[in-house]
Swiss-Prot record:
Catalyzes the deamination of dCTP to dUTP. It comes from Thermococcus sibiricus (strain DSM 12597 / MM 739). InterPro entries: dCTP_deaminase (IPR011962), dUTPase-like_sf (IPR036157), dUTPase_trimeric (IPR033704). This is dCTP deaminase. Belongs to the dCTP deaminase family. The gene is dcd.
Amino acid sequence: MILPDHKIRKEILIEPFNEKSLQPAGYDLRVGKEAMVNGKFINVEEEGKLVIPPKGHALILTLERVKLPDDVMGDMRLRSTFAREGLLGSFAWVDPGWDGNLTLAFFNSSEEEVILHYEERFVQIAFHRLEEPSKNPYRGIYQGSQHLKLSKRKIR
């Protein structure tokens, strides 16, 4: 079951919470303070925006911290405005028990720059209730993230 707006407001910790971001069946996450575009760190809060060049790759931190109970998972989708501009997003499930800001990956498939502004709504997250609480909620290496996180995968 996907949680409706009133249950999201009551059951999911999102901070800072923005009433304009609350949707009938989800919440619009906003561009946070940090990003990395083609390997270069950007202080989005200071710059006011980030620019993803054509065929460019970006990691973007969400403004919001999201904390999920052990019986709820998150599923994220790029807002259609950005898909229409050629932006593609690759997002993992947000596991039950997750707590932190999210680092999300994007690719600009277009021939034009895509500009995202600090605090702009860019990804919607929907919350799905599990049949029962997870016996093994997320407690992994990215738990508690407050800053942009690069891959912690070990390459041999």
